[in-house]
Amino acid sequence: MEWVRDETPENAVFSHWWDYGYWVQSIGNRATVLDGGNAIAYWNYLMGRLVLTGDNQADALEFLYNHDATHLLIDSSDIGKYTAFSSIGSDKDFDRYSWMSPFVMDDKQTQETNNETLFFYPGGLTLDEDLVIEDSGREVLLPKGGAGIGAVVVSANTQTNQYQQPYVIAVYQGKQYRVKLRYLNIEGRFIDFGSGIEATAYIFPRLDNNQGRIAVNGIGTALYISPRLMRGMLAQIYILEDPLNNFPNFKIAHTQSSLIVEDLRNQGLDLPEFVFYQGIQGPIKIWDVEYTGNEEIKQEYLDKDPTKYLDWKL
């Protein structure tokens, strides 16, 4: 919070998930859109729906404009909280509800052939929405809540030193399906393969403590960023750094690495912002919010009574 307190104007207004309110107000000494006491549930809904899981920049900017927000803050604990704010930000059919969980490489299952190395990341994740795939020339429905992801698989061509299109192993009713993903983010590169489901395999380092010595596997952990997550703002700008340029008016202003990553860097390790060590370690990121000039005041975003706009109870 030192940067917030010392490097932003005194009249700055910070937007973030509600439970950071007291933190920013008391330590950063800045105003916030959402209150740390969870006082206005409807605004939490709007923040969850239009910003954190929002699928377009215009809605996010208009909500923030109505609350005079100058900055957006996201912390790595929001990855674990995604289930909470995506549920709160959903409609009555839970259209934004989703979750993230790491898939950790099983070194013993790494397979090498003459020209390919196959990296296997086992795990378990239920589908957050229906997925229709093609299998042996026919369409197959993998239903949300019933089907799941059992592993993420990434391969590299050892002759060209190029990564190949990743896929996940989906499981439904005892049968496994290989489902190709369109995107791969690995070693600082975002690769678009042009086909596959609109999902990303996000690969980042795993750190192992072996008798007091830290060993780094630079591609040791995977996140499966589902199509639903990929439509959301948090995954696009916080994890992937807006590779599709869908949120250009959010300009990164400050990145504060996690204390664990900072400490390990001070010990000589060259680490990116995200690592897997005693859980996912990631930075605090803060963006300047630059408005387009097309935003308008909407009473719907200022009201505190959701019953005027929603036909279900938050």
Predicted features and spans:
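Extracytoplasmic
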Residues: 1-314
